[in-house]
Amino acid sequence: MKKLILAASIMALTACSAPQQEQINVMPEASLSSSNLVQGKTYTLTSKDVRAAQYVALVDSGRANIQPIHAKQNMRISLENAIAKQFESQGFRDSVNSENSVVLEIQEALVTVEHTIMENQMDGKVTLEVTAETPEGKLVKTFNGTATRTGALSASNDDIAMVLNDVIDLVLKEIANDQELQTYMKERF
């Protein structure tokens, strides 16, 4: 019995000291409007993450070793909160029982990093689909953002997070300033 307890204790301690997977901070910043487009129009916001994999970065160190890096925060919830703030700043109100709905679909959010001995190249890509639906119909729009950054030596997790957050913020700004989406929501919600 003592051996069993000792073995279980060793396994528990070993599991605690196992190296943790690297993670980066994903902090989307909502693009807020300075004035209301509407007053009190309601919608129901939902979101879904349809990415094939849940990591947000792939780091290729060139030694046939590709390492995925995940986000510390839940990507879907972070983006949903940012979109809700954007619409709120435009005068739309999120409600659980509205006949109008907005669906945010995360199709891609990834930074690929290639390291060589002397430099790194980071390519970020974010694709979000926004569907605004009313009883009379719906509008589906896809928003894309890309960025490329090169740097000396290897890229840190902070560098990777900066590229990803910058691309996400560009896409959020594009959504906030999209005239077709604004007009559809203003006239039909």
Question: Across the structure, where does each feature detected by a protein language model lie?
Answer:
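Sec-dependent bacterial lipoprotein signal peptides
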Residues: 1-16
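A structural "domain/chain start" motif
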Residues: 16-77, 181-189
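Surface-exposed short loop/turn segments
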Residues: 17-26, 90-140, 149-154
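Contiguous, function-dense segments enriched for cysteine-driven chemistry
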Residues: 43-44, 92, 127, 147, ...
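Short secondary-structure boundary motifs at beta->alpha junctions and helix caps
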Residues: 60-72, 138-177
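Mid-chain, structured segments of secreted extracytoplasmic proteins
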Residues: 69-97, 104
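Sec-exported extracytoplasmic/periplasmic mature domains
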Residues: 84-92, 111, 172-181
